[in-house]
Amino acid sequence: RSRTEFADVIAEYKTENTEIGIDVSKWQGDIDFDALKSAGVEFVIIRVGTADGIDGEYLLDSKFKQNIEGANKAGIPVGIYFYSYANSKDRAIADAKWILKQIEGYQVDLPIAFDWENWSFYNEFNLSFFGLTDMANSFLSVVEDAGYEGMLYSSKTYLENIWLNTDYPVWLAHYTSKTNYAGAFSYWQLCNNGRVSGINGDVDINIRYLATE
């Protein structure tokens, strides 16, 4: 199975208008954030948690505190993502409020991402495309009202076919060397087989596009 070296991504994609980073969760185990910083990691998007299925209780990612403390201490800018099982606007709002509680007291300068991938439940939820977008927008507006940036995480296929134009920044997942996604996006997750000093095993590598004046 092929690997994508972080240094190669820097060599290919780093410009004055991009930053190269990663996203992490408990699956990456114990991370050496100083090593990440030395390797040129410019940001890290940390999984805060998920829910135990539909209407389930919230589950804090078991490495969340360790990861956000490590990143804050190493001076690596932090974003957040949450894997949501929301099936209503109310639940999406509750998700956002739970996240805001978990990140209190930590430095979070980058967006909080709504990651919703429950396509197998989609019909059961009886949601229209409009309802789904409305749900994401509700989550993201709570995050923004609290002073954070919000963004929507999704794969290219679903961004093209399901999510109606959301007014929020997009974190595009498309595992390829050059994306042909035509919409606007602020972050691009380009692989899930990344390798970087400080992490044992695979990690997702991302590019952040800085707003050009």
Label every model-predicted segment.
Residues 51, 119, 157-159, 177-178, ...:
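Short, solvent-exposed loop/turn segments at secondary-structure junctions
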Residues 78, 149-150, 170:
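Hydrophobic anchor at the start of a short beta-strand
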Residues 100-114, 118, 162-184:
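Structural recognition of alpha->loop->beta junctions
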